[in-house]
UniProtKB/Swiss-Prot annotation:
It comes from Picosynechococcus sp. (strain ATCC 27264 / PCC 7002 / PR-6) (Agmenellum quadruplicatum). The lineage of its organism: Bacteria, Bacillati, Cyanobacteriota, Cyanophyceae, Oscillatoriophycideae. Mg(2+) binds at T26. It catalyses: GTP + H2O = GDP + phosphate + H(+). It is found in: Cytoplasm. Residues 10-214 form the tr-type G domain. The gene is tuf. This is Elongation factor Tu.
Length: 409
């Protein structure tokens, strides 16, 4: 069977459901796909389809994620649902499925729970740009005032973690009631069922409130150097995959990381032995650099738009430590532990000086399976920025994965 072509006639965004374990994330995901399928936007998926999520490996960590897609009138969404709490945490930290926005699901019957707080905090730390809220299980609440109280609590919680709590759209409804209605009649149109309408209203709020991600090609140029060659009579070529932006022949770029930053001019861009006028995000290219010796540049450096990224050694990070079963350590580690940090294309040794738990208390040791905030100092400066993902390795095996939450130096 020929593969269907991906039609790019609508703006695309990645979205995920966030929330406490029994508040209805997966049921909501099913309700959204069914409600939009009834309007002609994609295929309906049942709870069972989504819950039996296949395992994925991201940076060596096994994560259960279900990928679902659906369309509103204006946009195409790829939706990630993680059945388990641990999967959710791992997914966010490793960026297995990068989210452009999230739907925070809170049970109107129970109000915010400890995990709700944890997810909002995590969304903030790993850089999920925007959230909208769905208060689920409205059918179980007969008191209007109780709904208002829960809404108020959720808004306060969002504001506490620097999300615009007062502005975030909150929709109430019942995912289960919507699913039941759509199972009985899979072609319910807008205005025919109050519970289905509430799901469509939620998606309207996502369409309106969630900004589209900036496309990778529009961001400032960055390419991690994977290999370096010298071509007699032409100069030095750095090869790698362009992470973002575009690079044209004749442009000035900077070589950043490990040694002092220096600038150079791009004298050629090649891909598959063909010359290009410009390379774009996603391309695997060779970039010819003027006046640079082969010894001046090495794997682990990056080529970047001048001034767009700087080298750093000290940062704070949000990290998930692999369990023994996932191939991680069998024993805990302590402050001053010195593993390798695998950033983009290279390992750099670093010292982990301190750990803190979510509540800000300092932890004495870190166990396999923990999620922790840590302070790191690398032995060499590397091009680092907030939100960047990395792996922690020891003797070539991955023992953790993290996201830079704050640059210190």
């Amino acid at each position: 069977m020929a593969r269907a072509k991906f039609e790019r006639n609508k703006d695309h965004a990645n979205i995920g459901t966030v929330g406490h374990v029994d508040h209805g994330k997966t049921t909501l995901t099913a309700a959204i796909t069914m409600a939009l399928a009834a309007q002609g936007g994609g295929k309906a998926k049942s709870y069972e389809d989504i819950d039996a999520a296949p395992e994925e490996k991201a940076r060596g960590i096994t994560i259960n994620t279900a990928h679902v897609e659906y369309e509103t009138e204006n946009r195409h969404y790829a939706h990630v649902d993680c059945p388990g709490h641990a999967d959710y945490v791992k997914n966010m930290i490793t960026g297995a499925a990068q989210m452009d926005g999230g739907i925070l699901v809170v049970s109107a019957a129970d109000g915010p729970m400890p995990q709700t707080r944890e997810h909002i905090l995590l969304a903030k730390q790993v850089g999920v740009p925007s959230l909208v809220v769905f208060l689920n299980k409205e059918d179980q609440v007969d008191d209007e005032e109780l709904l208002e109280l829960v809404e108020l609590e959720v808004r306060e919680l969002l504001s506490e973690y620097d999300f615009p709590g007062d502005d975030i759209p909150i929709t109430t409804g019942s995912a289960l009631k919507a699913v039941e209605a759509l199972v009985a009649n899979p072609n319910i149109k807008r205005g025919e069922d109050k519970w289905v309408d509430k799901i469509l209203a939620l998606m309207d709020s996502v369409d309106e409130y969630m900004p589209l991600p900036e496309r990778d090609v529009d961001k400032p140029f960055l390419m991690a150097v994977e290999d370096v060659f010298s071509i007699t009579g032409r100069g030095t070529v750095a090869t790698g995959r362009i992470e973002r932006g575009r690079v044209k022949v004749g442009e000035t770029i900077e070589i950043v990381g490990i040694r002092d930053t220096r600038s150079t001019t791009v004298t050629g861009v090649e891909m598959f032995q063909k010359t290009l006028d410009e390379g774009m995000a996603g391309d695997n290219v060779g970039v010819l650099l003027r006046g640079v010796q082969k010894d001046d540049i090495e794997r682990g450096m990056v080529l970047a738009k001048p001034g767009s990224i700087t080298p750093h050694t000290n940062f704070e990070a949000e990290v998930y430590v692999l369990t023994k079963e996932e191939g991680g350590r069998h024993t805990p580690f302590f402050p001053n532990y010195r593993p390798q940090f695998y950033v983009r294309t290279t390992d750099v040794t670093g010292t982990i000086s301190a750990f803190t738990a979510d509540d800000g208390s300092s932890a004495e040791m870190v166990m396999p399976g923990d999620r922790i905030k840590m302070t790191v100092e690398l032995i060499n400066p590397i091009a680092i920025e907030q939100g960047m993902r990395f792996a922690i390795r020891e003797g070539g095996r991955t023992i953790g994965a993290g996201t830079v939450s704050k640059i210190l130096k």
